[in-house]
Amino acid sequence: MTTAPVSPLQAVVTANHDAISDDPAKAAVVFRAEARAHSAVASTVALGRFEIEVDEPPALGGENTAPPNPPVEYYLASLLSCQVVTYRVWADKLGIAVDGITARAEGDLDVRGFFGFDDAVRAGFGEVRVVVTLTGPESRERYLELQEAVDAHCPVLDLTRNATPVRTVVETP
């Protein structure tokens, strides 16, 4: 008997499905990050065993010491990288062939909200635009079907489209 080859992503999805089916508590995952401030507005952020540097451009009080500069660009990077992962996983799940994925994003931010110059202006992006280019043998309709699945399942996109409760606690010695 010949079995169809299983892609690495299919194997990951299947393993997670099986583990979660056996114990639904395994579906709950906690991600962590920890930041330490230094310089004027720069910080070092620990993500597991990795560290990244975050800074702002001089116009926002920073020293331009780390690419990308503003933390909002890290948000764009997070959104795009999550989109790429989600496109790969869902292309595999739906049996849609994708040869290449490129994505770009830009967001409009009015700094009056950040600096508190105008309380009617939100502090974050007013709009984010994402363009994903897919190459491969499938029809446009199949790729639009894939986009619908990605839009419904991309965790970082979900954070933006749906209000996520954030609880902040200030600790002092």
Which residues are covered by each model-predicted region?
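Extended beta-strand/beta-hairpin segments
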Residues: M1-A77, V89-P173
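Aromatic- and glycine-enriched beta-alpha-beta binding-site module
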Residues: V84, R88
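Alpha-helical metal-binding/catalytic segments enriched in His/Glu/Asp
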Residues: L79-Q83
